[in-house]
Design a protein with these regions (language model features):
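A generic structural signal for tightly packed, nonpolar segments enriched in small/aliphatic residues
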Residues: 55, 204-500
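Short amphipathic alpha-helical segment within the helicase RecA-like ATPase core
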Residues: 1-269
């Protein structure tokens, strides 16, 4: 999708469709839907339909007007943004996605989006607004139906954002939004692939190809490297599959980088999870191709980081394998020795994600990473706790948490911190080894995080459990059913924050 800026008045932009935001300014029983544009001609074009009460400004309400009077656009799309008092850049991002999904369903290929009141009335900074619109448009333009034989390629080809302000700053915001939006869709593309096509080897190849395109260093290692590094926890999972595992390492090492900060991103890359010997129910197992979403998120984040060029070192480690039942597979009751030397009693082979992450966190520390973030579709328990709305966030360091929380707020993604009290450590004690890989059902997401904490040790660390948010269970106005690319925007903001 081509993206560009226009500094003309919205009414003077020649386009197939002009999209504008309508916000609900009502108080008590007084309805007041207002078009958020300083352009009188645009407001006049919408005033009659607003006067009927048909347009209220309700969130994601869409009204398409044909041949609107007084403006050059062939159509005018009125996008309801909800209550004016709570409207934010995060809501604007979703509205841009909704605009794209609405218009491409009508075979419209190009449109313009007017920045709400040019960033004044809504209190949204113009640069943040431009970036939100671009990112949201890319999110809305993604469709997961690659393998349909009768697939119709309905995509928006061109987006013009109508804005006012400092041209250089707005162009920088546009470019940032484009990089992040494309990288989020790159992640979604990886996650969307079926597991017979997205094997650990193929994930490594896709990472290697991307790295060559954007200037990252990339290494992809197989089983011999795992054994050399004594990654017993990772290999314990990988040994049950005929598909070879892949240890994927991406390095971003810019000149002039801060010397005392080296960020480590660790991603779970289980390209298909049957549960192993502790096999999952058949119902819904097809979704387990998504179990590499954490790893894909880290690969996509590294793409964005390489293109945005922050002055901070970043290393990503993705631990890719299948979790399969076979005569070679690990069994409940086995004991594995992790890279750190800790012994792990295997209680449930379906608690495999924490095993691969354990060795990934240890390896990141060995490579000199000073601060760690991992992402994984780790537990069903986090879905019970937070539903399909919030990412479960854990941290062993309050300063690290505060820094990440600020980045997350800028990114506009829903995350919620959960506890890591020492009392929970009782849940991962083993009678024959240092720890177990699966504790009791109660506090399941916390138990998994407590397990990982053992391998982060004293290094400041964030754990993101994206099990409930890595894919959309149904179509939303702004995003298609399927992989979401969640957490990528927050990770990019987090990395940028260290360089500023």
């Amino acid at each position: 999708m081509n993206t560009n800026l226009s500094f003309s008045a919205p009414s003077q932009v020649e386009t197939d469709c002009l999209a504008v935001v309508v916000l609900d300014h009502s108080e008590k029983d007084k309805p007041a839907a207002i078009v958020e544009s300083a352009d009188t001609a645009v407001r006049d074009a919408a005033k009659d339909v607003i006067a009927t009460g048909e347009v209220t400004g309700k969130a994601f309400e869409t009204t398409l007007l044909h041949r609107p009077a007084g403006i050059r656009a062939k159509r005018l799309l009125l996008l309801g943004g909800g209550k004016a008092k709570t409207f934010s850049a995060a809501e604007l991002l979703k509205l841009a996605g909704a605009a794209v999904r609405t218009l491409k369903s009508k075979s419209i290929r190009a449109f313009a989006f007017a920045l709400p009141e040019n960033g004044v009335a809504t209190g949204i900074d113009g640069n943040d607004g431009v970036r939100a619109i671009v990112e949201g448009a890319f999110v809305g333009n993604f469709d997961p139906d690659y393998y349909k034989s009768d697939r119709k390629d309905q995509k928006i080809d061109a987006l013009t954002i109508v804005a006012k302000g400092d041209q250089k700053a707005l162009e920088d915001a546009l470019q940032t939004g484009r990089i992040v939006g494309e990288s989020q869709n790159f992640t979604r593309d990886l996650v969307n692939e079926p597991s017979n096509r997205m094997t650990p080897t193929m994930l490594g190849e896709r990472a290697r190809k991307m790295a060559a395109e954007v200037g990252l260093k990339c290494e992809v290692h197989g089983a011999d490297k795992l054994k050399e590094l004594k990654m017993g926890a990772f290999w314990g999972v990988a040994q049950g599959s005929d598909e070879p595992p892949a240890l994927i390492i991406l390095r971003y090492e810019p000149e002039g980088a801060t010397k005392d900060v080296h960020l480590g991103l660790v991603g779970k890359g289980i390209t298909f999870d049957t549960g192993g010997i502790s096999i999952k129910p058949a119902d819904g197992m097809e979704k387990m191709k998504y179990d590499m979403a954490g790893g894909a998120t880290m690969i996509g984040a590294m793409r964005a980081i390489a293109l945005l060029k922050p002055k901070v070192r970043v290393t990503a480690i993705i631990l890719a394998t299948e979790n399969m039942p076979s005569g070679k597979a690990q069994k409940p009751g086995d004991v594995q020795i992790a890279m750190s030397g800790k012994s792990i009693e295997i209680i449930n082979t379906d608690a495999e994600g924490r095993l691969v992450l354990a060795d990934g966190l240890c390896y990141a520390r060995q490579l000199g990473c000073t601060h760690l973030v991992d992402a994984a579709t780790l537990t069903g328990a986090v879905v019970v706790a937070l539903g399909y709305v919030n990412v479960g966030l854990f941290a062993n360091d309050d300063q690290m948490y505060e820094r990440f929380a600020k980045a997350n707020k800028r990114a506009g993604e829903n995350m919620w911190r959960l506890p890591l009290d020492d009392d929970y450590k009782e849940n991962i004690k083993s009678s024959i080894a240092d720890i177990v890989n699966a504790g009791p059902r109660h506090g399941g997401a916390i138990n998994a995080a407590m397990f990982l904490k053992e391998f982060a040790e004293d290094t400041p660390w964030i754990h993101l459990d994206i099990a409930g948010t890595a894919w959309m269970e149904e179509n939303k106005p702004w995003i298609a059913k399927g992989p979401s690319g969640v957490a990528l925007r927050s990770l990019v903001e987090f990395v940028k924050g260290w360089a500023s």
